[in-house]
Amino acid sequence: ALALRGMSLFDLTKLYGYPYTYDNGASLGASIVTDVVEKDYLPQRSTVAQCYDQIINDLEASVSLLGEDFNKGKINKWAALTLLSRVYLYHGDNEKALNAAKAAIEGAECHQYQLWTNAEYPTAWSNDVSEASTNKGEVLFEIINLTTDSPGKESLGYLYSPHGYYDGCVTKSFYNFLKKDNDDVRLKIINVATKAQGYSSS
């Protein structure tokens, strides 16, 4: 729970606050809520610095509590360390970021996580993510989301679908950059939608 709370607050702080290094976290970030509150509770926004203090405390505590084994759809020690490394980087603690990343890589390698090959990369994004799956590849943590889960407009898949909100698209400039090398494996996971696909005519 600590790792997921830290991850959630990290995402909210990035979304609603300036980067920490902009003003050493002095500006407003997200609201920190660590207790169960009443439905009419109106939390005040904390500073970015306060948010990062909470995020780091949560993630550092979680690293010592989480298990090391792979568990599909569940966060483990290596995923928490990876996330902590990213938080340290955003916080400007480069040495801590490097040390956490090294610890995550070494631990993951000991537990048979392996980087995808170029041949595996295009299909890895559509691998089975059900709880029964034992496939992990280089995935440290992922959300279990099946085609049968909440197929309506509030589902995760609808956010990225060309027929939905289309929030997961790459920019044209980035796509053109990738096309400079026709062997770039990332081109194989991009679905180029036409305007007709992307917009409803109704």
Set out the residue ranges of the language-model regions.
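Secretory-pathway/luminal and periplasmic proteins that interact with or process carbohydrate-rich
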Residues: 8-19, 90, 107-116
